[in-house]
Structures are given as C-alpha cells and as structure tokens.
Amino acid sequence: MKNFINSISRFINGLKRPSKKTNIKKLHERGEILDSFTFRDATEEDTPELGKLHAIAWAETYNAKTPNIQLRQYQWQKAFTEENDGLWFCILVVNAKNKLVGFAKGKINKDEHTSQLHGDLNKIYLLSDYQRLGLGKKLFTLAVQRFLSKGINDMSLFGVPQNPSCAFHEAMGGERLYSEKGTFDGCYRWDDLKKLAVH
C-alpha cells in the first residue's frame, strides 16, 4: 500500500512539471541555447545563489512553499567552512548570464570495516524550466566521472519516494533498494559506474 501511495504522489508531482516541448520553447524565448550552459565546481563565493537555487528547486520538486532561503544558505556556508575535508564536491550548471540553474552534490563515504570508498549522490536538482533538456543527464555523468576519478566505482542515492525524479534515476540505470518490509523509500544503487561514464 505504501509503495502504491508513493507512486501516486510521484505521478501527481510529475504532472506539474513542464514538458520537454514547453521547456525548449521557454529556452528559445529567453534567448538561450543548450551549448551556452557551462558546468563547474561550486566555491564558497557561490553560497548565496546556491542556497537560493537549492531552496527553489526543492520547492518545485515537491510542490511545496519555498523553504527558508537563508537556512539553505547557512547549510551551504557550513559545508564550505566546516566540511572542508575533500570528501564532497558540488558541480553547478550555469547559464550564459551566469545564473545557477542546477547542481549535484556528491559525498565520499568510507566503509568502517573494509576502508573501501563508496560514492553518495547526495543531491541533484535542476530548476523545472531547465529539465528535460539533457542538462540533468550531463550533470549526472559529471558526478559519476568525479567518483571514478577518485577510484570509486559504485554509488548510492538516498532520496524521497515521492520525488518525480525517480524516473530519471531509473533511466540512468539506478537499481531500486527495498526495505526488509518490501517498501521503496527512494533509495537507488549503481554498482558499476564505469558503464555510466560514457552516457
């Protein structure tokens, strides 16, 4: 029953997202072209805009009121100042006007028993007007390549089962992980990142 309810929630949330045709039209109306977008690592100076992007993209994803932008900015500021251990990264999607329109945050986790490193795709978001244009696929691939560059060949994503982006995760080869009770809680696993690096 829980899986069914979550699937309905994903479907409803997904209905409110713009179609590919709509977003291509909006892209042209803004005078943008796909080749004009760049991808780069986030820096501490990006904190104000990154926090704003995070808050808005989260609200769009779950059809919720925009969370406190200042809270998100604080969280990112804390990440840059207190978690500067080299065990995480954030890749940004930037348009020609230098506006942030998407990001992916990855974390490197170390197994306490084997000392083996594992990838955690902690967050991946695009503003709704920039979805279904291939930018998310490129962003995902860059995150995969970053993990591979660290010698990591597997990755997990611990999301929310109501997230309509579950379809995207599965399109990118994510395998659903189920709880002992058989419920899907939004978690995915990729066991061979080398196969994904060429997407």
Task: Label each region the model flagged.
Residues 170-179:
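Conserved acetyl-CoA-binding loop of GNAT-fold acetyltransferases
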Residues 25-28, 32, 41-47, 52-127, ...:
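Acetyl-CoA-dependent GNAT
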Residues 121-124, 155-159:
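Conserved hydrophobic beta-strand within the GNAT/NAT acetyltransferase core sheet
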Residues 134:
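Glycine-rich phosphate-binding loop
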Residues 131, 156-166, 182-185:
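Conserved beta-strand-loop-alpha-helix junction that forms the acyl-donor binding cleft
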Residues 1-33:
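Acyl-donor-binding surface of acyltransferase catalytic domains
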Residues 54, 168-170:
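Conserved active-site tyrosine of GNAT-family acetyltransferases
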